């Protein structure tokens, strides 16, 4: 495969591609390249893909925890837009997340909120989140802004009373992130206004203890 990554020429053999391969989905295949990930769209992914113009715009926006496109990937022979690069973050299980101290966890939610505000101020609307697309290395990152789905709204949040490990992990993944209320952030048709009337991180902060873990917090609140 012959690629142009911005202005950098890169030629990869099938063996190279197999060595660098990280995984794939309905939308794309991803490969590790230095400190970046190459996201190369599948030919049949259709409307799921970002177009080159959108990817280029996002690459010029700085965010803390939303991993946006960094460089544009094109076919070196015909110039066709193939995908983009983003920062490589080594993933960890949700076990690491539920062991985070609440102070650190809430700071991460605050940074995610700031990222959404930054995108909103640049006239970029994030409609879909997929909370399975998280990367954790002591910090929490959300990957692929084109494929996110918020699982719950604050009105639907409930504290689970059965706090075994599997249920707790699912709760943290599906509900706690939803409590960041990222889904409330929408581009306004007239003025770009960030809606944080129900940013639930503030509500959690009122009941959380800085030195307890996310697991301890959930168990305490579920009593």
What are these regions, as identified by a protein language model?
Residues 32, 88, 135-136:
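Conserved hydrophobic "DFG−1" position in protein kinase catalytic cores
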Residues 125, 137-223:
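C-lobe/activation-segment region of protein kinase-like
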Residues 95-136, 140-141:
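Conserved kinase catalytic-core helix
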Residues 45, 93, 150-152:
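Conserved protein kinase catalytic core
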Residues 6-9:
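Ser/Thr/Pro/Gly-rich, low-complexity intrinsically disordered stalk/linker tracts of secreted
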């Amino acid at each position: 495969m012959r690629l142009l990554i911005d202005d950098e020429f890169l030629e990869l053999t099938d063996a190279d591609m197999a060595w660098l391969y990280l995984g794939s989905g309905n939308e794309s295949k991803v490969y590790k390249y230095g400190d970046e990930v190459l996201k190369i769209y599948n030919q049949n992914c259709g409307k799921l893909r970002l177009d080159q113009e959108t990817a280029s715009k996002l690459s010029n926006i700085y965010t803390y925890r939303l991993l946006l496109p960094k460089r544009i990937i094109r076919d070196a022979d015909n110039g066709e837009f193939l995908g983009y690069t983003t920062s490589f973050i080594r993933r960890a299980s949700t076990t690491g997340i539920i062991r985070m101290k609440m102070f650190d966890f809430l700071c991460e939610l605050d940074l995610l909120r700031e990222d959404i505000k930054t995108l909103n101020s640049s006239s970029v609307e994030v409609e879909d989140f997929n909370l399975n697309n998280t990367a954790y290395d002591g910090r929490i990152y959300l990957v692929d802004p084109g494929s996110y789905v918020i699982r719950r709204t604050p009105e639907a949040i409930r504290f689970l009373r059965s706090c075994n490990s599997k249920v707790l992990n699912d709760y943290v993944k599906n509900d706690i992130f939803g409590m960041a209320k990222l889904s409330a952030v929408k581009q306004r048709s007239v003025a770009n206004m960030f809606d944080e009337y129900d940013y639930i991180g503030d509500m959690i902060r009122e009941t959380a203890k800085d030195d307890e873990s996310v697991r301890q917090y959930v168990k305490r609140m579920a009593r």
